[in-house]
Amino acid sequence: MSTKYESRYASSPQTVKQYDTQELRNEFLIDNLMQNDTINLTYTHYDRYIAGSAVPTSSPLTLETIDPLKSEYFLERRELGIINVGGTGSVTVDGTVYELGLKDALYVGMGNKDVVFASDDASNPAQFYLNSAPAHTNYPTKKVSKAEANKIELGTLETANHRTVNQMIIGGIVTTCQLQMGMTELKTGSVWNTMPAHVHNRRMEVYLYIDIPQDQAVCHFMGEPQETRHIWMQNNQAVISPPWSIHSGSGTSNYTFVWGMAGENLDYNDMDVAKITELR
C-alpha cells in the first residue's frame, strides 16, 4: 500500500509545558515527508487537519481515503490544498490534468473522487505537499501559480526578517470552506520568520520548512507567549502549531516555509500579536 498515515491527538498548553525535548517532537514534528513512491499523511485532531506529502517516482500515486475519515473517498467531506516543492509534475482531478511546476499550488474542492499524482521526470520527481481540512460544500478546483500569488513584503534586513509572503490558496484568489495556504520566502541575510510572533485561537496552523541548505537548520518556536519551547527543524520537515501557540522560527541561513491553516474563520489578519519584549 502506497498510503501511510498516523493520528495525533490535541494537547493542552498545561500539558505541553511539562514535555521534554522528545515528547515535544513526538507530538508536533512531522518528519516522514517526501518519501519516494509514498503518500504520507498525518491526521491531527486540531481542527481535524491533515498534512502530508505525495512523491510519485516509479509510477503515479492515487489519493486514497484513510480509516479516521470513515468515508468512501478522501474528499467526500474534505477540501485539499497542494503545493509542489519539487520537480515538475501533474495532479489529475476526476480526469482533468493540472500541471504544477516548482512552488505552484492547486486547490481541490470537496466531492472530487479521483486525485492522481504524477511526476514528469522520475529522476527529479514532483514533491507534492498536501493540506486538507473538513468542508461543507464544493468549491471549484483551481490552480494558482507562484506568479499569480498575492505577494506581501514584510520586515527589514536590519531586523533579519525581510521576507515575501506568497498568499496562494486564500480569499480573493481561491474560494474555500476554511483552508488557507501560502508560502513565505526569506531574503538572503534574513533568518527570522513571523516575528513579532502571534497566536490565533480561531485557527490552527502547520508549517513545512523547505529550502534549508544542507548542514543548516531552523529553530522553530512554539508554546504560549509566556511559556515558549523550541523544536529544531531540518529540510522538508513540518510542525503542527496549536491555536494557542506562537509559531515562529530562526534559521542558521535563510529558508522558505509553506504555511497552511484552518479553523473558525478565513480572516488572514485575525491574530493576537505577542510583543517581542514580553516573550518568555
UniProtKB/Swiss-Prot annotation:
Protein role: Isomerase involved in ulvan degradation. Ulvan is the main polysaccharide component of the Ulvales (green seaweed) cell wall. It is composed of disaccharide building blocks comprising 3-sulfated rhamnose (Rha3S) linked to D-glucuronic acid (GlcA), L-iduronic acid (IduA), or D-xylose (Xyl). Catalyzes the isomerization of 5-dehydro-4-deoxy-D-glucuronate to 3-deoxy-D-glycero-2,5-hexodiulosonate.
Gene: kduI
Annotated positions binding Zn(2+): H198, H200, E205, H247
Family: Belongs to the KduI family.
InterPro entries per record: KduI, KduI/IolB_isomerase, KduI_N, RmlC-like_jellyroll, RmlC_Cupin_sf
GO CC annotations, alphabetized: cytoplasm
Signal peptide region: none
Biological processes per GO annotation: D-galacturonate catabolic process; D-glucuronate catabolic process; pectin catabolic process
Cofactor needs: Zn(2+)
EC identifiers of the protein: 5.3.1.17
Cofactor binding note: Binds 1 zinc ion per subunit.
Keyword Transit peptide: no
Protein name per Swiss-Prot or TrEMBL: 4-deoxy-L-threo-5-hexosulose-uronate ketol-isomerase
Induction / repression: By ulvan and rhamnose.
